[in-house]
């Protein structure tokens, strides 16, 4: 076991990402990150006492190259004795039908497939190959989109059944590991373009910033991500205590006592509103959230549509969430 494999195993134990008897589904595209994920897991699976399987998505976006990726990953799994699952998607057609970007469509298709495999083949964890450079790029991408604290946190090491055990590793470390182990990988040349937003950030924006501020950008973005994560955990704890201390803030019942809400800071009000909306299955933008928060300073009877047939209305001293029967999206 070399130093990279030891670091990987130590991180798995420290973060408690896998338990004895877990079945881990590895998302493997054939690129360097996912091939490192595959070989690192294969090297420590016996120590972790976990079963491995691989899921490969053929998005049929690159013609013969997509099929070659599929064959490559299939052969790698056969060589390692790991179960291989593949699904082909007509991503371009689905993207058009869903009226979503290719990136978003591929993401949704990918995770639907992973969830289906977990149910059918009893996988308990899904591991992806995101690393620290991906996290830094995500923070920058979210910053450009005007994200709040949650967005600046970047990629979480764990989200439900999904784990990202390569987050402590840089892209450079991953490539060095593959070269040391003489593991080959597939290059997706579409990653070198700038058509997609993330590629534009990776290939144009970051190099320009690093040229001016050498070796400072990635560590700085990583620190921002860590600080945002710590702050988000503090906020979650603080809001949970607020809700426990004030029975009038009944998120589950869909009503919030106006008098109590008015005693809170605007930040606290919005955090509570976001949690109440989440329980309604809603995630609204900042404009709608500001309008809902503004109800606290209005007369009774005023309302704000929150989307998906839900409106927030000021009535009898409470903010109430009620169904309108109109599912139109006002977000």
UniProtKB/Swiss-Prot annotation:
Keywords of the record: ATP-binding, Cytoplasm, Ligase, Nucleotide-binding, tRNA processing
Binding-site residues for ATP, renumbered to this chain: 29-34
Annotated catalysed reactions: cytidine(34) in tRNA(Ile2) + L-lysine + ATP = lysidine(34) in tRNA(Ile2) + AMP + diphosphate + H(+)
Domain of life assignment: Bacteria
UniProt key word Transport: no
Single GO MF descriptor: tRNA(Ile)-lysidine synthase activity
An annotated GO BP: tRNA modification
Name of the molecule in the record: tRNA(Ile)-lysidine synthase
Gene (name only): tilS
